[in-house]
Structure formats: C-alpha cells, structure tokens
C-alpha cells in the first residue's frame, strides 16, 4: 500500500494542536510539546497510527465492507462529500440525526420516502400537483437529501466508521460503540480518544489536514476494492477480532 509520509503530514499541518489551555489530559502521550501556547502533536506517534488505520480500511474494503465517512462541521463537510463519493462510500456531511445507526429501521423508512420523492420529481408527478403541494414536496425532498442523501445507498449498517473531529461527532461514536462498529477517528489535543478504536492524533480543523486524512482514506478504500474480491469471510472475522483487541 502507498503510505502517508511525515513530510505529507508536516506540509498539511497535522502537528498543530489546539491552545494549551484547552488540552485534554487523555491526549498527553501524543503531545510532543508546546510552541507559542499551541500544543504540538508528536507525528512520530501519529504516522504509524494513521498508516495502521489505512491498512485496516484497505483490508475492510477488500472484503466488500462499507466504511461510513462522517464529518459534519463546516470545514469538513464538502471534503467528506467529495472523497466519499470518489470512492463510492456512504457519508454524513450535514448533521448527524440521532438514531442514524441505533434506530436504523426508522432511518430506512425515511430513505424510502426520499426515493419516492426523487422518483416523483422525475416522473412528472410534481407537475400534476398544486403549486403549494409541489413546493412542500420539493422542500421535503431537499431536506431529506441533505440529511440522508449520503447514506441512501448504504443498504444496512456500515462495517466501520471514519470520523473527522471526535468531539463534534460524539453522538455518532456512541451509537457505533453500542453496536460494536469499529471507529477510526481524528483526535485533536482538546478531545478525548475514548470510544475510538483506531486513533489518529492530529489537527482536525486545517483544511489541508482534513483533505489529507479523507483523501488517504478514500485511496485506501479504492485500493482495497481493487485488490480483493476473494477471502472476504475470513477477513471479516479477522477485522472483528482486531477491533475487539482494540
């Protein structure tokens, strides 16, 4: 597999944490020091951990498993959408709806409604409605597309979840934890790594850093799909045992 290098990380600013006064003591072992009251993340720790996460994702994708990309804050949403689409993975880029995983049955009903409205908007049904009714359905369609468009083809629960900014996506992580879905997460110096199976200590705000994480993850998914069609079953067992060992 093509690995991310220290140089890639330095150029993207992965090593710049948050102001020292906002630090989370649970991230202490990943912090190299401080400069101008900003914590500096130890990339000698981050680099192997990131490459481990990429290997895990590549192996998962080789077994035709689904990785859900999650990043709903403004700086991440657009890149999440683009990179997930590039590798054909489901994503949540707007807002995490409570129960997206733990109450998937209800979510599935909303996805069905989204598909019905999509079909109606294309088959001429909207044109036969009153202006008011057509407008209401168009608004419903837009709202559902914004919330669920990225997972409408997921077809069931994901096999792993990749999260940018674990603080911002704490509800998503707790839902994944409840269901035993492995979590890969970018954890900045102000965040807690709890509930994350594959920790990537790094800056979760800088656009170039976010692009590096997501671009590399999408590449890993594409490589895995390309490399593997066989051995999927043993492989899912291996992945499950890896996640259980933490």
From Swiss-Prot:
It comes from the Bacteria. Gene3D superfamilies: Glucose-6-phosphate isomerase like protein, domain 1 (3.40.50.10490), Helix hairpin bin (1.10.287.610). The keyword Transmembrane helix does not apply. One of its GO terms (biological process) is translation. PROSITE patterns: RIBOSOMAL_S2_1, RIBOSOMAL_S2_2. SUPFAM superfamilies: Ribosomal protein S2. GO terms for cellular component: cytosolic small ribosomal subunit. Keywords: Ribonucleoprotein, Ribosomal protein. GO terms for molecular function: structural constituent of ribosome. Pfam families: Ribosomal_S2 (PF00318). Belongs to the universal ribosomal protein uS2 family. This is Small ribosomal subunit protein uS2. The lineage of its organism: Bacteria, Pseudomonadati, Pseudomonadota, Gammaproteobacteria, Pseudomonadales.
